[in-house]
Every structure is written in structure tokens, then in C-alpha cells.
């Protein structure tokens, strides 16, 4: 099944994105890596991520396609290929825009469009989406893209653009952390309430 194959390949690509991790797998897990139909060299994780992208395109899932682009971007960043990473991560962000336009906007409405860098933007379009009940988006989807974009821009010496993406990444992390804390508190209160009901009954 393309979906599960793609997820497996993408997971491996992420694990081996950095040269040191790849060397570890190459040294300790050669027998497993030899099962694939391409050379086990430094491009191996990139080929896996590209193959995952093909699988997800076949499955036609925007979320997974964006994730595969992020995996490719992560590999390119780890190998100092920052401009290529930036180009790839732009495609990931376009997947988010495409999803948003499909479900929430007229195609010509660009007010909520996400950009890799928008000079002067202090509201960080994309972050407010998370707090809107009517807008369904996955915070981790955007945060992973922003994290890698920050690395790409830093590698290219573009500090403002790097900081912009890093700030969005941190804002999303903070928002999801608070959200999880609230959910945890709610579950705890619910459990306490059930316990109190049992005691009183």
C-alpha cells in the first residue's frame, strides 16, 4: 500500500538525514539497507525521501506530500545545500496554502497565504489559524516546515528571514504546549469528578 510504504521510507529518511546518523545505520544496519534497490551511499536518505514523495503523490495526500518535502529539505539542510532546501521547503508551504485555499477560501483570496518570509509581518499568518475553531489545520505540519526554513535561511546568511521562521516555529510550539496542558488539566479534572461521584454515591 503506497501510504504505508511512503511512511516507512520517510521515517527512515528522517532518521538518516544527518551524516553521522547515516554512518551509524550504514555501519550497524547494512543488511537492512541493502534490501533497497539503490546504492547505500550518502545520497541514500535523499533517495528514500524522494521515493516517499512519489508514493504520497500516488496516494494524493497533501499532508504527506508536504511532509516528504520537509524530509528532503531536512536532508539538504544537513548537507549544506541550503538554497535547494529552501526551494523544496517552499513547495511544502505551498501544499499548506493549497489545502487552506481548497477548504477555507476563494482561490483569489491571498490574505491568509503563507510565505517563506514576509518582511514586516508580525502577526505570523498561520499561527492564528491554530486558535480558530472553524479552521482545521495541523500545527505540527506548519511548525516542521518553519523549523527547517529557519535552518535554510540561517545557512544562507539571511538572519531576518531565519528569525521570522524560528519565531513562528516557537509560537506554534508554545501554543500546542499550552493546548496540551489544558487538555491534560481537563482530563485530570474529569477523573477527579468521576472519583468524587463514586465517593458520594
Which positions does each model-derived feature cover?
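Extended alpha-helical scaffold regions
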Residues: 4-27, 67
Amino acid at each position: 500500500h503506497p501510504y504505508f510504504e511512503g511512511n516507512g521510507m520517510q521515517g527512515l529518511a528522517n532518521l538518516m538525514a544527518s551524516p553521522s546518523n547515516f554512518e551509524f545505520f550504514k555501519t550497524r544496519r547494512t543488511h537492512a539497507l541493502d534490501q533497497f534497490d539503490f546504492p547505500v551511499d550518502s545520497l541514500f536518505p535523499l533517495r528514500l525521501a524522494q521515493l516517499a514523495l512519489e508514493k504520497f503523490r500516488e496516494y494524493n495526500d497533501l499532508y504527506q506530500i508536504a511532509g516528504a518535502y520537509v524530509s528532503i529539505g531536512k536532508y539538504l539542510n544537513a548537507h549544506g545545500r541550503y538554497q535547494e532546501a529552501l526551494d523544496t521547503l517552499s513547495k511544502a508551504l505551498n501544499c499548506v496554502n493549497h489545502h487552506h485555499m481548497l477548504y477555507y477560501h476563494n482561490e483569489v483570496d491571498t490574505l491568509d497565504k503563507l510565505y517563506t518570509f514576509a518582511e514586516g509581518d508580525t502577526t505570523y499568518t498561520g499561527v492564528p489559524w491554530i486558535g480558530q475553531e472553524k479552521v482545521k489545520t495541523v500545527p505540527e505540519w506548519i511548525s516542521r516546515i518553519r523549523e527547517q526554513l529557519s535552518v535554510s535561511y540561517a545557512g544562507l546568511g539571511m538572519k531576518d528571514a531565519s528569525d521570522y521562521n524560528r519565531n513562528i516555529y516557537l509560537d506554534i510550539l508554545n501554543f500546542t504546549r499550552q493546548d496540551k496542558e489544558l487538555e491534560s488539566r481537563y482530563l485530570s479534572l474529569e477523573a477527579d469528578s468521576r472519583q468524587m461521584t463514586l465517593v458520594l454515591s
